[in-house]
Amino acid sequence: MWGAGQMMFNKILVLVSADAGRISDYKTLAQVVFKNLNPATDIYFSQGPMDVLDHSCSKLGFGGKMCIDGTFKFDEEVDESWQLSPGSHRDGSTQLNAAELKRKFEEIAAVNLSLLDKQIPCLIISVQKNRRNHVRELHEMIGALKEMESVKMVLYVEHTVDANDLPVALWRFCNNLDPKRDHFICKTQSKVVANKYSACIGFDGTIKSKEFDNFQRDWPNIIVSDQKTIHAVDEKWNTFEIGAFIPSPSLKFRDQLYGTEAMVE
């Protein structure tokens, strides 16, 4: 599919079985994908052409791609060395505690556990990097926790991003990710099933810098209106006759700015 016209610019591709249900039913679709997914064997990475506006690529217009195989697996497709259905034997939402994770790891700003309650074994964690390989090392420590055996995936976002605002967190995460470069697998001995391994994949969706990531390109700042513009629009709103007042979307993102220039300072 990555060779089919505009699909060559795709960065994240998810495949599901034909009977997975409506692809517009995101909750059910995610449940099916994660039920069928072994992070260690069912995610494929490649590289190729990317949109020139994709700022996360190490090289302009060329970067990593990821295909997640969320289809049903036949017996011959299953690697028996892995725990076959991670997460089915325990309720991760009752095991993991956001406050405890923040206490153990001071670089964590916020933890979103809400997907676990929906039978989607995925966490979103806001983290403030302060060194090279920070997110990789953090993921190895988090993935080794016994409470994490039911979790298949962790998405790391910048500390300025509200991990509990799911649409915004996923938007920022996907923008800042090169899947091939920014993933890491944590393989652990199962503490529940003897002679089996479990896997949790982590993705670094934080901003990339020369200092911490050896990233050589400019990193764009998020775009927001200044206070003067916001105030001017608010004052004129009733004259536009376009309906009830809507606060400026920029207000929500001002805390995610890094400096005042077009590029992150």
Region roles according to the model:
Residues M1-E265:
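Charged, compositionally biased interaction regions
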